[in-house]
């Protein structure tokens, strides 16, 4: 199975919007309202989110997931790709380069956001 950055982004957006049940999310993947992907595809991307340090959580023996929170890195990544127009440009840039890593996607999205902020404010950012 391959990493699907569109699904990764969608999962982060969904998780961020979910209310916490106490200090945990107990996630039944079928209840997330993601109909364009199979249960196995969603589960695999959840494992990648945890392995990649974007989500603090674990898979339960039942096959569900328990998550404590999006990590700082998870919030940073999501903030860099939240805007649909920035996300589309980020993916286009990655495709033109012939490949990508999550760090490259984040850096590309961050660069696009930086450019957009500089255009809106007239303030040059040194990031």
Regions found by a protein language model. Give the residues of each.
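Short amphipathic alpha-helical interface segments
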Residues: 2-34
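Exposed, interaction-prone assembly regions rather than primary DNA-binding/catalytic cores
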Residues: 29, 87-127
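Basic amphipathic alpha-helical segments that dock to polyanions
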Residues: 41-53
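Short beta-strand "wing" residues that participate in macromolecule-binding interfaces
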Residues: 57
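Short, amphipathic alpha-helical interaction segments positioned at domain boundaries
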Residues: 66-97
């Amino acid at each position: 199975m391959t990493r699907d950055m569109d699904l990764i982004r969608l999962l982060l957006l969904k998780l961020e919007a979910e209310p916490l049940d106490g200090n945990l999310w107990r996630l039944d993947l079928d209840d997330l309202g993601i109909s364009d992907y199979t249960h196995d595809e969603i589960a695999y991307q959840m494992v990648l989110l945890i392995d990649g340090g974007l989500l603090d959580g674990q898979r339960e023996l039942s096959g569900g997931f328990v998550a404590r929170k999006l990590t700082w890195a998870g919030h940073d990544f999501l903030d860099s790709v939240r805007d649909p127009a920035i996300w589309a440009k980020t993916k286009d840039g990655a495709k033109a380069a012939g490949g990508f890593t999550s760090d490259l996607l984040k850096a590309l999205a961050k660069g696009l956001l930086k450019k957009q902020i500089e255009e809106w404010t007239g303030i040059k950012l040194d990031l």
